[in-house]
From Swiss-Prot:
It comes from the Eukaryota. GO terms for biological process: formation of cytoplasmic translation initiation complex; translational initiation. Residues 31-165 form the MPN domain. The keyword Mitochondrion does not apply. Keywords: Cytoplasm, Initiation factor, Protein biosynthesis. GO terms for molecular function: metallopeptidase activity; translation initiation factor activity. This is Eukaryotic translation initiation factor 3 subunit H. It is found in: Cytoplasm. Belongs to the eIF-3 subunit H family.
Length: 344
């Protein structure tokens, strides 16, 4: 029986290509996305997303000066473990070829991914986005949160890797010394790019007419508090990540103790060796042959620190989600209290 794969794979980065008007030396300062693309991403999750399962797809468009225009997208199909012959690169090329035949923008400009309660900061996302930005400098990743969107407000954010993190990933130096030298922390890993949703004039007129026809039965319903399930789940995920961080700290502390202990043993061995050679010299004996101390005392392998940074970044996301949720509810409570006092 076929079983679904876990959502750990990420879209494969395309070969480098640029569009007319692209300026590789200037960063992307704004993203303009068509409303149709947003609807396609939402539809993709509603059709194939199940709970915490992640859906992914490719973004197409072009670059105009410092603005990235996303005009179309297509999803990656959910394949099972039995689909060993599925080739993601071949699938992307066939889709782009089909879009080119119907005169639709077919240049890669990034990829999108859904998230479960803001859980998107991971090594898989980092590696995939690095591949995209390394091939096409203007590439972005769009993160769509269906949980927040279902509560009444569209949650769609665009991220890019910072130049510091790009250099670290190129050098592949994820040690504590390398990260310290680059002066990079979890707050300097991703940079958010502002998004502007663009619709045609006819769609704007239609939305204006629909807004005029829509009536709110009870305006006080807007003051209803959000469900506590969202807060409970966010706190649970936050505690899980704090536990992961605690385990990483224990591993690094163990490595530091072992390294210090080995350095002490190495120093003691060197001193004993020098004393013994001094005694042999006073007795007129030949000194002991020199030995490679570094081979005798091999330093322990340092644990990579990039995973710790990713965990810290995810903890920060959960904290921001909790802060946003509680601030909205507190605002509603104060507004309800003011209205109640005014009516009484």
């Amino acid at each position: 029986m076929a079983t679904r794969k876990e959502s750990t794979s990420t879209p494969t980065a395309p070969m480098a290509s640029t569009s007319p008007g692209a300026t590789l030396d200037s960063p992307v300062k704004q993203i303009q996305i068509e409303g149709l693309v947003v609807l396609k991403m939402i539809k993709h999750y509603q059709e194939e997303g199940q709970g915490s399962e992640v859906v992914q797809g490719v973004l197409l468009g072009l670059v105009v000066e410092d603005r990235l225009e996303i005009t179309n997208c297509f999803p990656f199909p959910q394949h099972t473990e039995d689909d060993a012959d599925f080739d993601e690169v071949q699938y992307q090329m066939e889709m782009m070829r089909s879009l080119r035949h119907v005169n639709i923008d077919h240049l890669h400009v990034g990829w999108y991914q859904s998230t479960y309660y803001g859980s998107f900061v991971s090594r898989a996302l980092l590696d995939s986005q690095f591949s995209y930005q390394h091939a096409i400098e203007e590439s972005v990743v769009l993160i769509y949160d269906p949980i927040k969107t279902a509560q009444g407000s569209l949650s769609l954010k665009a991220y890019r890797l910072t130049p510091k993190l790009m250099e670290i990933c190129k050098e592949k130096d994820f040690s504590a010394e390398g990260l310290k030298k680059a002066m990079i922390g979890f707050e300097h890993m991703f940079e958010e790019v502002p998004i502007v949703i663009k619709n045609s004039h006819l769609i704007n007129v239609l939305m204006w007419e629909l807004e005029e026809k829509c009536t709110v039965a009870d305006k006080h319903e807007l003051l209803n508090l959000s469900s506590s399930n969202h807060l409970e789940k966010s706190l649970q995920l936050l505690m899980d990540r704090v536990d992961d961080m605690s385990q990483d700290i224990v591993k690094y502390n163990t490595y530091s103790r072992n390294l210090s202990k080995q350095q002490q043993q190495k120093h003691q061995y060197t001193q004993r060796r020098q004393q013994e050679n001094a005694q042999r010299q006073t007795r007129g004996e030949t000194p002991l042959p020199e030995e490679d101390v570094s081979k005798m005392f091999k330093p322990p392998q340092p644990p990579p620190r990039m995973d710790t940074l990713l965990i810290a970044g995810q903890i920060n996301n959960y904290c921001q989600n909790v802060k946003e949720f509680t601030s909205q509810n507190l605002g509603k409570l104060f507004m309800a209290e003011a209205l109640q006092g005014h009516n009484s």
